[in-house]
């Protein structure tokens, strides 16, 4: 099992995913509050530094919520975004994927969101033994949907302008329905 006291570092050819730290909060808050990014979050209001810090303190206490900072290692050589696995149900071996954003404007359009998604899903399946990863995305967020489809997510259902997508060996569970 993964823990915040011994967080993993996940690497691919050009990316490193490392755990979010308190030092990252100003950067991630600035990314999250960009109009072009926050419009895709279900809670799309501007977040204050105090709200972000309070969220982080609560996050630190959870053993089923892991935020990773995406670092590009070759060209930009800096943090460029974030991605998360959360609502992890260790018993059912499933988790929610999300909070994906490429906040650094120079890093957009380079395929980093797709690569980060792919390596985090592979880590979740291989190292954590998760059999199902699911997410929710606005049906009109076509760039995100393209990333998710390229990483083997499929649409389980659509409701109220939101797609529910799943991937993994137990993607639709025994009942064949999205929970």
Task: Mark where each language-model region is.
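Conserved acetyl-CoA-binding loop-helix of GNAT-fold acetyltransferases
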Residues: 109-123, 146-150
């Amino acid at each position: 099992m993964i823990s915040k006291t011994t967080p993993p570092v996940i690497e691919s050819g050009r990316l490193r995913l490392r755990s979010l730290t308190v030092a990252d909060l100003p950067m991630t808050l600035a990314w999250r509050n960009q109009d072009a990014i926050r419009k895709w979050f279900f809670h799309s209001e501007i977040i204050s530094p105090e709200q972000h810090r309070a969220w982080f303190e609560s996050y630190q206490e959870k053993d089923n919520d892991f935020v990773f900072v995406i670092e590009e290692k070759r060209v930009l050589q800096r943090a460029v975004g974030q991605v998360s696995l959360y609502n992890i149900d260790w018993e059912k071996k499933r988790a929610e994927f999300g909070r994906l954003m490429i906040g650094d404007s120079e890093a957009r359009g380079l395929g980093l969101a797709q690569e980060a998604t792919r390596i985090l899903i592979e880590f979740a399946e291989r190292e954590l033994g998760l059999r199902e990863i699911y997410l929710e995305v606005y049906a009109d967020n076509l760039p995100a949907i393209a990333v998710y489809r390229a990483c083997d997510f499929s649409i389980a259902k659509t409701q109220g302008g939101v797609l529910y997508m799943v991937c993994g060996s137990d993607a639709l569970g025994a009942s064949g329905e999205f929970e």
